[in-house]
Each structure stands twice: as C-alpha cells, then as structure tokens.
Amino acid sequence: MRLTVGALLACAALGLCLAVPDKTVKWCAVSEHENTKCISFRDHMKTVLPPDGPRLACVKKTSYPDCIKAISASEADAMTLDGGWVYDAGLTPNNLKPVAAEFYGSVEHPQTYYYAVAVVKKGTDFQLNQLEGKKSCHTGLGRSAGWVIPIGLLFCKLSEPRSPLEKAVSSFFSGSCVPCADPVAFPKLCQLCPGCGCSSTQPFFGYVGAFKCLKDGGGDVAFVKHTTIFEVLPEKADRDQYELLCLDNTRKPVDQYEDCYLARIPSHAVVARKNNGKEDLIWEILKVAQEHFGKGKSKDFQLFSSPLGKDLLFKDSAFGLLRVPPRMDYRLYLGHNYVTAIRNQQEGVCPEGSIDNSPVKWCALSHLERTKCDEWSIISEGKIECESAETTEDCIEKIVNGEADAMTLDGGHAYIAGQCGLVPVMAEYYESSNCAIPSQQGIFPKGYYAVAVVKASDTSITWNNLKGKKSCHTGVDRTAGWNIPMGMLYNRINHCKFDEFFSQGCAPGYEKNSTLCDLCIGPLKCAPNNKEEYNGYTGAFRCLVEKGDVAFVKHQTVLDNTEGKNPAEWAKNLKQEDFELLCPDGTRKPVKDFASCHLAQAPNHVVVSRKEKAARVKAVLTSQETLFGGSDCTGNFCLFKSTTKDLLFRDDTKCFVKLPEGTTPEKYLGAEYMQSVGNMRKCSTSRLLEACTFHKH
C-alpha cells in the first residue's frame, strides 16, 4: 500500500512537471548571436510575466529550414520569418501559419508591409529591363525583397530551361551575391561573396549586406527593402549618390520609393503550427514583451534591437507586432500574386508564354450546386470545371488563392470579395433578356429591392416594433437578408447585439448557439449553405411561413413562391395576399407595391474573379450564356433554372450584363451601398473579411 501511495505521489509530481511545458513557448534561433539575444529575451521576460503565466525558452538551430522543421515537429514553437520563408513554412508537411506580424511606421499608422526596391549607383546608365549581364546583390536565396520579387519580374527573361532556377539566374547576371545559395553547384551566385554565407554574421547577408555588396563589393544593383538605404545612410547627401529602378524603366531618387518599387511585400511574420500551435501563449508573451521591451521602453533589453548583429529574432526597423486574424493562412498573408510568383519560379513556368485557353473553375456551395455544376461541366465540353466549398466565404477564399476562378455573389459577399482583391466581371440581369443595351452603354443594372415581409394576419407588426419578434434572414453578410435591414437597425439601436433585439430567428452563418439560430431546421443547422433549409431567399420566406414573424428578402421572393409557382408542400397553397411589406415609415403595403415600400435598393448579384482571370471568365461565360442561357429547359441544360432554387445563379436571371473593363467593386456596388456595408463592419462576424483587410490598417 505504501508503495502504491508513493507511486501515486511520484506520478502526481511527474504530472505537474509535465504540465509546465504546456505553458512554455520555445523560440527558435538560427545563429549563436540570435540564441544569445533569445536567452536575454527569456531572462527579461521572467521579470515581467506572472508566476503562473507563460514561459519562454530558446532552441538553437543552424538555419531557417531547420527551425521550420523543428516547429513542425513540436521541438520548437515560434520564430520570425521573411515572406519567402513564410511560404515554405506553410507548405505540407510543415503546415505552419502566421500568428503575428511585424509593423513599421507608428502605433497610430502601423504598416504591415514594405516595398521591395532595386537600388543602383547614380551615374550608371541602365534601366530595369537592361539588367542582363550586370552584377546583382541579393538579401538571400528565397527571400522576398532580395530574391522572390526581382527574380519573379525577370523570370520570363531568363534563358530556358528555367529549372533549376539558380542556374538560369547564374546565366542571366555576370556575377552575383546570393547568400544561402550552393557555392559548389552555382559558383557564379557566390562570385561577389565567396561561400554565400547564410547567417547574419556574414558581411553580405540580409538587407544591409546586399547594400554593402552594391556599395563596396562590386555589385551593380541591390535588391532590398525601401528603408535599407535610410538605415545605412542617414545623411541625405550620401543617399543622393543612389537611385531606384522603376517598373516603367525609369529612375527616381531613393526617397520616392512609393512611386518606384518592384512590389509591396507583407512584413515579416511570427509563425507557429497550424494545429496545437500555442497561438494564445505566443501572443501573450509578445504582447507583454512589447509593453515592457518595445521601442523606447527599456534600456536593459530591446525587442527590436540587435547589439550583436542585425535583425536578430525580429527586424530592427520593426515598431511593434500585431496579432494576425485567426483565418489567415500563409496564402492569405502573402497574397495570390506573391504565392504565384514563388510557385511559378519553383515549377520553372513562364506565364507570359501561354495563351489563356484554360477552363474556368466554378465554385459550388452544396451537393445540389455541385450536381448542377458537374452537369454544366460535361455539356460545356470541359470549358467549365467545378470546385466545391462549404460556405460562400470558403469559395471566395478558394478564388483568392487560385483554387477556383469564379462564382456569383450577392452584394454583401461581393463587398467581402472586393476587400479580398476580387473584381466584378458580369452582373445578373432580371428585367429582360436583352442585356445588349446596358452592356453597350456601359451602365450597371438597376438592382433589386430589399424588403421586410410579414404575414397579413399579424396586423400589429410594423417596422417600428420589431423588437422581440422572430426574424428570418437569407444569411449573415448577405444584402437583402442582413446588411440592409441590420444596418438600418444598427442606426437605431447603436449596438450589434441583434440576437438580443430579436427573441429568436434563423440567420444562417450566425453563431450556432445564438437565439438567431433557434428557428433553423437544416441537417446542418444554421449553416450558410443549402444544408440549412431556411438558407437563402426561399429559405427565409419558408422560415416566415412556418415559424417567424418577419422575413428579410428580395422583392420578388413572395411573388416567386405564391399562387402555385412553388410546388413544394409548404408553399403550394400560399396566396400573395397572405403577406404584406413593412415600410420604413411604419406603414404596411401589399407585396406588389415594393417600389414604394422597401428598405433599400440592392445591387444585382455579380460574377467575381481574380483580376488576371477576369477576361477569361467573361469570354467563357459569354459563350456559355449563348448556348445555355435560354428559357427552353425541357430536356436541356439551363444556366438559370434549378432543381430547387437559385443554384449557381438566381433563377429569375434573364441574361448577363458585361461590366465595363476596369469596373471596381466600389464602382459596381455604389457609394451608398459601400457606406452602408462599411458602417456594418463593426458588427461583422466575417473572419475572411478580417483576414483580407489586415494589411489595410
């Protein structure tokens, strides 16, 4: 018995010992100097963290790849990486993600990006398109400003074969310094810095090293960030001896970097594991560290200073750190163009050499949409391919990342897509089948009306006494069902607690344990897709018929689901006069009077895509509409007809309006709608919107 008790006590003690590492964040250092700073970081954090709080430990490796592998294997937990390494860290099997971003500028105006620039000596006479045969200085192999961006720009000028990339670059320049390159396999890449040393102890490594290579090492051009020359040469007279190469093959003074840069690059990021990554612990440590050891906070230890070298653990020019939104992975953090540049380089592909006759990958939201899309793909003879996602935001993200190319969105989601960099391509048109006139005139369709519908029998309900009623919505962040009515309510109640304003409701996409999901009935309750029976226009109207007091829909919804137009059991006996509209002035009107009794006019649903894919989407969709846009669907495939309701496109679409080239989301949605959605931003629960606007402080 005594032995058993002793064993239990030992196990308990061991359990306590094993529990401690759960609160320990192991920071990975890539050099002796970094490890020395990390140890100082660790020791100083002990003095400011609570006794029961997180702890910092240091793990020393010899390179960034080794640290990335260590974090992936849980031997370490965090480190700061340049964008090029963030890409590598995000790939399988590493599966790391950004959890915090360095920012520059100031606390009031934080910048989570910097400019990649090409610096040359004043008095030389070549431009960006004349770099072949010159001597180049780079921050490091695979790094953003020093390699990924400049080589991405020069990629199609490299002689074939372009793989391995290092060999092609060796042939392009007469000599280079590319730290971290293989000096045996690619000796010309190490001509200006013998050995190509891959740590901050090497004289030509990193931003300062690349500039030193230009200044003192025989280089003709240095690829660095815009602040490098200001850090190295604080005197304007010294800086005036250098210039920037611009994309339009001109030159500008180094202080005009905002008008003369190669690319805008996301700042360095702290990365952690995607799963079980200790994100909260990491941020708790970084938050406290900034408060006590940030810029100008302490003389004993400074987070953003490197007495033993340069840019140790963090960049010395960083002003602080911001937490990255939880939805943001490495692709959203870096951006599609950046990721594509890396991928093209690694695969040895030159995009300029191909004619865009590729299929358009359409994003489908549910099993029913996927079934219709697959049918479309077959009958289109492969011009359309299909990609699936669970939610509209998942689809938008896939388009942003290049996994899909297009989908149709209502105004609310088109706003989010626009904030993520997508553009409107073609608009649905509901008035007539002659889309030529608005297309030729370059005008946008008028739009539809957002209305509030109630049962005619509930005579006491008005727009002014909706508090405590049961509400039915098409979905969170959708135009008629959410943004417009909730925006109007917000202006009245001045808070975002809509689940306290209504007693119950169904708002697909809202928090599932909320009262605004109480009325939902789908197999995947409150999901923002067709797995929720009350999703969308028809779903919200059905919610009103079966459970609710008010439904927020489009003006055609009642007309499309009454007088026998919808044969479903719940709708087949409904009459138009069974329902009325709530007017904002507190009156009610018949549903046919929507033109004089509506909440607002909404932009028509619109097809969105990435900028570089927009022309192809427009061309394919135009040809597909010619073939399958008619109304004779007997035995034929029709774009604008569905087995249920509004699959891929709205069923009442007559044709597509081609939008003028260069149409931005702001132009299409209109200033009034942009403002109303912008006002709702403080109430937004969209994780994707949060991620896409992170770099737009």
From Swiss-Prot:
UniProt keyword list: Disulfide bond, Glycoprotein, Ion transport, Iron, Iron transport, Metal-binding, Methylation, Phosphoprotein, Repeat, Secreted, Signal, Transport
Highest rank taxon of the organism: Eukaryota
InterPro entries in alphabetical order: Serotransferrin_mammal, Transferrin, Transferrin-like_dom, Transferrin_Fe_BS
Disulfide bonds: 28-67, 38-58, 137-213, 156-350, 177-193, 180-196, 190-198, 246-260, 363-395, 373-386, 420-692, 435-655, 472-543, 496-683, 506-520, 517-526, 583-597, 633-638
Predominant cellular place of this UniProt entry's protein: secreted
One GO biological process term: response to bacterium
SUPFAM superfamilies: Periplasmic binding protein-like II
Binding site for Fe(3+) 1: 82, 114, 207, 268
Cleavable signal peptide: 1-19
Binding positions for Fe(3+) 2 per the UniProt entry: 410, 448, 537, 605
Keyword Ribonucleoprotein found: no
GO MF: enzyme binding; ferric iron binding; ferrous iron binding; iron chaperone activity; transferrin receptor binding; transmembrane transporter binding
Glycosylated position list: 513
Any matching Pfam family: Transferrin
Binding site for hydrogencarbonate 2: 474, 478, 480-481
One Gene Ontology CC term in the entry: basal plasma membrane
Physiological role: Transferrins are iron binding transport proteins which can bind two Fe(3+) ions in association with the binding of an anion, usually bicarbonate. It is responsible for the transport of iron from sites of absorption and heme degradation to those of storage and utilization. Serum transferrin may also have a further role in stimulating cell proliferation.
Assembly description: Monomer. Part of a complex composed of SLC40A1/ferroportin, TF/transferrin and HEPH/hephaestin that transfers iron from cells to transferrin.
PANTHER family referenced in this protein's UniProt entry, alphabetically: SEROTRANSFERRIN, TRANSFERRIN
Protein name: Serotransferrin
Gene from which this protein is expressed: Tf
